[in-house]
Amino acid sequence: MPGASDPVSPDPTRKDRDGSPSPGLREPDTGLRIDVFSLFPRLVDDFCSESLLGKARGQGLLDLRCHDIREQTTDVHRTVDDAPFGGGAGMVMRAQPIFEAVEVADPPRPLLLLGPGGRRFDQALAAELAAGDGFSLLCGRYEGVDHRVRQHLVDGEVSVGDVVLSGGEVAACLVIEAVTRLREGAMGNAASTVTESFGESGLLEEPQYTRPAEFRGWEVPDV
């Protein structure tokens, strides 16, 4: 498995399998395929059904497939976690349902685990992923995933910052939006991705104003 600092490069030779889009969305022709594996797939699917991402899905530019890891459990209680060997606080996500969820979906690679120890997600990595045909995200929960998932299943780990979240779903939404808006046709104005913060210059965007020219005594500077 690549280390946390290794480049994350989508496989351009990977061929997608047929899948079912979310209700109300047409089947994309050449859209960017992103598969998300989560215990709460609706969190991601609902967020990505609104605004720019919802439009991209409707236009066939984004083929988002959210998979419920719990569907691959084998017991009546649909157990996805267990106590860690050696003791300690919290629970660990079991390897079996994660492996089987991925194997059933046959998702595009790389498959990236969202976690605090991975490569820092930034605009450069977003552009790298946007240049490929697709990738997949694994959302952890609780105290994380069984380490064998890191060793034998995922291709790398990505971190959205030095913060603690309850799960990877919010981070997944961040990654999906940052990548999708870099795809051709996703933005209403193609120049937006060039002139905005972290665009071609790599710098922050200049201050922006709109009407009225004077508000509560504060005036827009001369252009």
What spans do the regions from the language model cover?
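N-terminal nucleotide/polyanion-binding subdomain common to many enzyme families
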Residues: 1-105
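Hydrophobic/aromatic beta-strand patches that form the interior of the parallel beta-sheet core
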Residues: 35-37, 65-67, 110-112, 135-137, ...
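Short, solvent-exposed amphipathic alpha-helical segments in soluble enzyme
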Residues: 51-56, 127-131, 152-153
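Short glycine-enriched loops at secondary-structure junctions
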Residues: 69-72, 141-145
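Short clusters of hydrophobic/aromatic residues that line enzyme substrate/ligand-binding pockets
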Residues: 80, 85, 121, 129, ...
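S-adenosyl-L-methionine/SAH cofactor-binding core of RNA-modifying enzymes
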Residues: 92-141, 147
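Structured adenosyl-cofactor binding patch, chiefly the S-adenosyl-L-methionine
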Residues: 145, 149-198
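Long, charged alpha-helical interface segments
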Residues: 199-223
